[in-house]
């Protein structure tokens, strides 16, 4: 059909189907952990037959090795308005082991320098508790919280920014989300000032007018 009408939309649709086929063909191999060594599984704390965040971290490493360029991992259950002490202990143990194993594994395999690892969420938690008794927790808090980056040309061992004595507001080297985006785009080789989209007659930047690359974070 494409040879008859030479419609680029038909060619695009054909390529989409071909890409989907290649991805489906590769998926069973990617998720087969039987080829991983016992030492690797123990390092991640993975039971191949049970879903876990650590298992997802190991799958992420396998996807990176296979050439996947963007991977997003989710971990649910952090909305800790109650039962914070009990729930966070459990979740931190599960997450810390998997993410530490992933970073170490990427470094051992020579992949960390070309892989940018980003850890964080859309907000933190208040430094004061809500609720009472054994069911206390912390509310949403966007005014001062932490994210971390590893690999991908990021300077290791660097702390950027500081909160007040209560841990409530960021007061030193405050970093806006547009600064974060500008820095990440820079590490991906994209000039954030030229990455624009047009809406209602004018150009907009994803990093707005104030976003800047935070060079103190770069190796």
Please report, for each region that a protein language model flagged, where it lies by residue:
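Ligand-binding pockets and gating/stacking loops
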Residues: 1-219
């Amino acid at each position: 059909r494409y040879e008859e009408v030479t419609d680029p939309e038909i060619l695009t649709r054909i390529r989409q189907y071909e890409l989907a086929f290649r991805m489906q063909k590769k998926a069973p191999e990617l998720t087969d952990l039987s080829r991983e060594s016992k030492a690797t599984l123990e390092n991640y704390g993975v039971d191949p037959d049970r879903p876990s965040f650590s298992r997802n971290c190991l799958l992420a490493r396998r996807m990176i090795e296979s050439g996947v360029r963007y991977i997003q991992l989710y971990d649910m259950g952090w909305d800790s308005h109650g039962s914070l002490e009990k729930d966070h202990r459990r979740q931190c143990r599960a997450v810390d082991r998997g993410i530490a194993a992933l970073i170490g594994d990427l470094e051992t395999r020579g992949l960390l320098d070309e892989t940018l690892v980003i850890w964080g969420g859309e907000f933190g938690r208040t430094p004061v508790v809500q609720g009472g008794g054994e069911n206390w927790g912390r509310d949403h808090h966007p005014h001062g919280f932490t994210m971390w980056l590893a690999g991908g040309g990021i300077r290791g061992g660097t702390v950027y920014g500081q909160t007040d004595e209560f841990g409530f507001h960021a007061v030193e080297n405050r970093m806006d989300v547009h600064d974060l985006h500008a820095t990440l785009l820079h590490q991906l080789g994209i000039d954030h000032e030229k990455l624009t989209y047009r809406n209602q007659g004018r150009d907009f930047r994803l990093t707005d007018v104030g976003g800047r690359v935070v060079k103190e974070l770069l190796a």
